[in-house]
Design a protein with these regions (language model features):
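Short hairpin/turn module used for nucleic-acid contact or packing/dimerization
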Residues: 110-162
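C-terminal helical cap(s) of enzyme catalytic domains, especially alpha/beta-barrels
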Residues: 36-51, 104-127
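The DNA-recognition helices of helix-turn-helix-type DNA-binding domains
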Residues: 32, 106, 140
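Gly/Ser/Thr-rich helix-start
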Residues: 79-80, 136
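Short Gly/Pro-enriched loop/turn and capping motifs at secondary-structure junctions
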Residues: 80-82, 103-104
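Helical hairpin unit composed of two closely spaced alpha helices linked by a short loop
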Residues: 96-106
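Alpha/beta enzyme core
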Residues: 1-75, 81-97, 143-145, 149-162
Length: 162
């Protein structure tokens, strides 16, 4: 089931989908993004492509859902533009990642570069299989799960070591 990030309680929704028989979820489906042309004073289509900066919500929810809803496969999507971003999603708990924008911008041959980045990182870290590190940094596995929780910006930085 492909989900939008506009739901209020994504872990609860994913758990209900799992209980109803869903085997997996995609976090996230990117919605149509409208824009306004202020010179022509009319609605126009916004950027159809994701940016690498959109990865944060994808990582956050993969980390939370993988910790709270065992037994469902998670595909991370949105903001994945390179091998490092794919690794972040896998470390957060995603089983797989999906890419689209980078294929349009760099072509299908870029997949080999992403795979090479992942394989190189795995070799340096001593991993032989993705299953060895999948979810290693999900909300249940990190010292401070507050990194995944919704919190005020200033509260986080007030407690951060400088």
């Amino acid at each position: 089931v492909k989900l939008s990030k506009s739901f209020a309680n994504i872990p609860s929704l994913v758990d209900k989908l799992r209980a109803a028989g869903a085997k997996g979820v995609v976090l996230f489906n990117r919605s149509y993004q409208p824009d306004i042309d202020i010179d022509k004073v009319q609605m126009v289509a916004g950027d159809v492509f994701t940016s690498a900066g959109e990865i944060s919500d994808t990582i956050r929810h993969a980390g939370i859902v993988s910790a709270l809803v065992p037994g469902i496969s998670i595909a991370s999507s949105t903001g994945i533009h390179d091998g490092e971003a794919a690794l972040k999603c896998l470390l957060a708990g995603a089983h797989v990642t999906q890419i689209c924008t980078v294929l349009y911008k760099k072509g299908p041959q870029f997949v080999a570069e992403m795979i090479a980045t992942i394989e190189s990182w795995m070799q340096v870290k001593g991993y032989y299989s993705v299953s060895e590190f999948r979810g290693k940094l999900n909300a249940a596995s990190v010292k401070s799960a507050t990194m995944y929780e919704r919190m005020q910006f200033m509260k986080y930085f007030a407690n951060k070591d400088n």
